[in-house]
């Protein structure tokens, strides 16, 4: 090796060291941050996804973490090849020929074609498994909840409760109120024939698709609706909107579903189930579809309690107690604790100052 080549080699080594030093420092700091913060690698790889409270949510989170790991592996390989080529295969002043070309290299092209296909196939396979689990509908859910969204609040009703252990059976459908929502006749034309409405033969005020129950919780301007659910039971949610498109989203479910007006007529799926809720407590819910002026304030709370407490709560509601009163009977906070109502006086207060 000549003196000039030796000097060039030393410079390349020093340049490589300078380039790798920030990368090594960043990796070291990342490891220290995760370790000292008490976070697990699972939390770090979840990148903000919360711990779920249903079996479906746990599967969805694992799928997400798997996709993140796969992306990081592919990214590291690609970045490594880019940096390797940039550092070790730069054109040197002594180069007089073109570097080796890889065009029409059949084995390499096959590898670069098959590898992405295998990665995508694996992700697709696990996605289908998790999706089937999340969308599965059992024929005999133990609790059926009617969810009605409207601008800009929620109504929750207990349509049916049938615990498999036989300790609680309840049919809460209110057919009289539902019948009252049937479309009124449009009248008759000059020939005495009944007029046909604009919406599938019905008038625009028809709300016969909505469900009504004897025990309901209605959100208001001053009170966040609290949906009380039992832990450890399969629960079905039937979603309907009274006006525009909304979206039912409980972040801890790691799942959301759009709430459509007249879902049958719109060919939309408005039902989903959770196998069980594995943790008691209070969990915030939101509307996740832009639905107008106060969309961001359209919140609710899911309050998960033990099955015996749920039975006592439902009995109190059947006996005529309000939602807050029934919650107090089972030693629960009477109002929402994860969110609060939107203060509609804020503009008035600002103008008065």
UniProtKB/Swiss-Prot annotation:
CC annotations in GO: plasma membrane
Q: Where is this protein localized, as stated in its record? A: Cell membrane
Q: What's the main place this protein lives? A: membrane
The keyword 4Fe-4S appears for this protein: no
Task: Report the top EC class in one word.
Answer: translocase
Cofactor(s), by name = Cu cation; heme
Q: Where does Cu cation bind?
A: 246, 287, 291, 295
Q: How does it sit in the membrane?
A: Multi-pass membrane protein
Q: Which Pfam families does this entry report, sorted A to Z?
A: COX2
Q: Gene3D superfamilies from the entry? A: 1.10.287.90, Cupredoxins - blue copper proteins
Q: Name one GO molecular function term.
A: copper ion binding
Q: Which residues form the signal peptide?
A: 1-42
On whether Phosphoprotein is a keyword of this UniProt record, the answer is no
Instruction: Report the protein name in the record.
Output: Probable cytochrome c oxidase subunit 2
């Amino acid at each position: 090796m000549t003196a000039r080549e030796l000097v060039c080699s030393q410079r390349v080594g020093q340049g490589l060291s300078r380039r790798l030093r920030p990368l090594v420092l960043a990796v070291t700091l990342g490891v220290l941050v995760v370790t000292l913060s008490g976070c697990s690698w699972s939390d770090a790889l979840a990148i903000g996804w919360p711990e779920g409270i249903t079996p479906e949510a746990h599967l969805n989170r694992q799928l997400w973490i798997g996709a993140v790991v796969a992306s990081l592996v592919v990214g590291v390989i690609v970045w490594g090849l880019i940096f390797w080529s940039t550092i070790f295969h730069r054109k040197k002043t002594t180069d007089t020929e073109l570097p080796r070309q890889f065009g029409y290299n059949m084995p390499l092209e096959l590898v670069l074609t098959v590898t992405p296909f295998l990665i995508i196939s694996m992700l697709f396979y696990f996605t289908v498994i998790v999706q089937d689990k999340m969308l599965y509908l059992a024929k005999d859910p133990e609790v059926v909840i009617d969810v009605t969204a409207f601008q800009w609040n929620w109504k929750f009703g207990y349509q049916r409760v049938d615990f498999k252990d036989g300790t609680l059976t309840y049919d809460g459908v209110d057919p009289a109120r539902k019948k009252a929502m049937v479309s009124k006749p449009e009248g008759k034309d000059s020939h005495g024939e009944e007029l046909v409405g604009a919406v599938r033969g019905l008038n625009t005020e028809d709300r016969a698709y909505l469900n009504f129950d004897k025990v309901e919780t209605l959100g208001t301007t001053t009170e966040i609706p609290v949906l009380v659910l039992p832990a450890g039971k399969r629960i079905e949610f039937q979603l309907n909107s009274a006006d525009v498109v909304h979206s039912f989203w409980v972040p801890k479910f790691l799942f959301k579903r759009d709430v459509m007006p007249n879902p049958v007529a719109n060919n939309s799926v408005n039902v989903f189930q959770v196998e069980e809720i594995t943790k008691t407590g209070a969990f915030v819910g939101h509307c996740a579809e832009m639905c107008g002026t106060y969309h961001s304030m359209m919140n609710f709370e899911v309050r998960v309690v033990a099955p015996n407490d749920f039975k006592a709560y439902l009995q109190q509601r059947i006996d005529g107690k309000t939602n807050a009163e029934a919650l107090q009977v089972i030693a629960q906070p009477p109002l929402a604790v994860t969110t609060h109502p939107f203060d509609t006086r804020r503009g008035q207060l600002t103008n008065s100052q």
